[in-house]
């Protein structure tokens, strides 16, 4: 049997159909999940290449397998492009995910039982920053900081108080749902005061940092972690950066052989392509449009009477607080989904509602901006969202509003390109 002549449709019609239907779904909805984006055909081509066949444990020129000449070139390109993109001295492109990038830092710099200080999950932090169900909350003494109860902004005085009290070994900045800029210099000041390492997780804002639309943490943090998708618009994967090459050596050993085995060379090649795309001038214009679109989305939703957490956004994220409207995040997200608008339910700071229900929704602009949406289009999208939310408030059965908006979504989305 010659497998080299087989295609997916002939080999596995079930998976082939799933992929075709998912392509139809992605092309026909307004995608507002803040952690999602659409990668270029070039990135897809690299990720689906024969580099997936190559095992390459170790690092370039220090592999445990022969035949790594070409994949060494690919990884070196990814490393050098990442260093250029973020203007830093060290990069590791091997983490399979953002979570594993964070785990590698913990393995390199901490011992079980050490104290870490990160943003609480309900304030917009990430599972890997010390949440109880996560390994970071099980292996370490995890202390969490919250937001200011009046402004919903990061409370640096509270972080400093907690750092003085608990003396963490590692202070973490970063989030999965926070719409404002972070003062990395202040975080480093607090870390230095208590003798802690400072790690910045920029998974959501890596594209903003790379283009200068958000302060870079690399002048302040001992170590920076990120994903390579989201605003960076690359393949799903992780990335570790630093200007401290001694810490970089510890990270390398922690990641391999400490945490991972063979790197995914097809994904690393795709990361290299994405970094090359992000180094082009038009990528900065893209990120600026992402932010402008988020601002337009937040503004119209406010005009329609909805509470936007912190009163707006500095990045790609818009958090809608639905508590005063008597709508759960789950109800809103499901109704929007039926209307052709995809987002996610999201917890609101200091809200006691179950994370499976929530009192808010999180909206993001990267994916639709990739398809070509401008501010005027997000004005229309905001009105569509508000129409659905109005219906959720007024009627248990929201099917009439959902059908109306679905028709509007279908008409709008046809104007924007998708994969051929």
Swiss-Prot record:
Residue(s) at site: Plays an important role in substrate specificity: 229
Cofactor: pyridoxal 5'-phosphate
Record: residues binding (6S)-5,6,7,8-tetrahydrofolate: 121, 125-127, 246, 354-356
Residues recorded as bearing N6-(pyridoxal phosphate)lysine in the entry: 230
GO molecular function terms attached to this record: glycine hydroxymethyltransferase activity; pyridoxal phosphate binding
E.C. code: 2.1.2.1
Record has Kinase as a keyword: no
Catalytic activity annotation: (6R)-5,10-methylene-5,6,7,8-tetrahydrofolate + glycine + H2O = (6S)-5,6,7,8-tetrahydrofolate + L-serine
Complex formation: Homodimer.
Record-given protein name: Serine hydroxymethyltransferase
Organism field: Rickettsia canadensis (strain McKiel)
């Amino acid at each position: 049997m010659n497998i080299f002549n087989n295609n997916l449709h002939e080999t596995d019609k079930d998976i082939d159909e799933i992929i075709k239907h998912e392509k139809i779904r992605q092309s026909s909805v307004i995608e507002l999940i803040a952690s999602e984006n659409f990668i270029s055909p070039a990135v897809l081509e690299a990720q689906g290449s024969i580099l997936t066949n190559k095992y390459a444990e170790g690092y370039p020129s220090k592999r445990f397998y022969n035949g790594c000449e070409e994949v060494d070139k690919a990884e070196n390109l990814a490393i050098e492009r990442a260093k250029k993109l973020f203007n830093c001295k060290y990069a590791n492109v091997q983490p399979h995910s953002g979570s594993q990038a964070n785990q590698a830092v913990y393995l390199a710099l901490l011992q079980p039982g050490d104290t870490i200080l990160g943003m609480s999950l309900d304030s917009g932090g990430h599972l890997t920053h010390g949440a109880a169900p996560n390994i970071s909350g099980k292996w370490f003494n995890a202390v969490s900081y919250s937001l200011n109860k009046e402004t919903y902004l990061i409370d640096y005085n509270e972080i400093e108080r907690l750092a003085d009290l608990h003396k963490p070994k590692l202070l973490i900045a970063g989030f999965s749902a926070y719409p404002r800029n972070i003062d990395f210099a202040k975080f480093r000041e607090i870390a230095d005061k208590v003798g802690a390492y400072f790690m910045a997780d920029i998974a959501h804002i890596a594209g903003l940092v790379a283009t200068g639309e958000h302060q870079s943490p690399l002048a302040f943090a001992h170590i920076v972690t990120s994903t390579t998708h989201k605003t960076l618009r690359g393949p799903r994967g992780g990335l570790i950066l630093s200007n401290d090459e001694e810490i970089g050596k510890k990270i390398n050993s922690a990641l391999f052989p400490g945490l991972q085995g063979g790197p995914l060379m097809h994904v690393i090649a795709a990361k290299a392509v994405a970094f090359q795309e992000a180094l082009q001038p038009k990528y900065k214009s893209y990120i600026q449009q992402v932010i402008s679109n988020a601002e337009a989305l937040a503004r119209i939703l406010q005009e329609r009477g909805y509470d936007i957490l912190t009163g707006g956004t500095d990045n790609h994220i818009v958090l809608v607080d639905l508590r005063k409207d008597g709508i759960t995040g789950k109800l809103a997200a499901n109704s929007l989904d039926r209307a052709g608008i995809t987002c996610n339910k999201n917890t609101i700071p200091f809200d006691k509602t179950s994370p499976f229900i929530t009192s808010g929704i999180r909206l993001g602009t990267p994916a639709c901006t990739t398809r070509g949406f401008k501010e005027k289009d997000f004005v229309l999208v905001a009105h569509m969202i508000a129409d659905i939310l109005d219906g959720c408030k007024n009627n248990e059965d929201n099917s009439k509003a959902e059908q109306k908006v679905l028709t509007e979504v279908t008409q709008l989305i046809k104007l924007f390109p998708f994969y051929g």
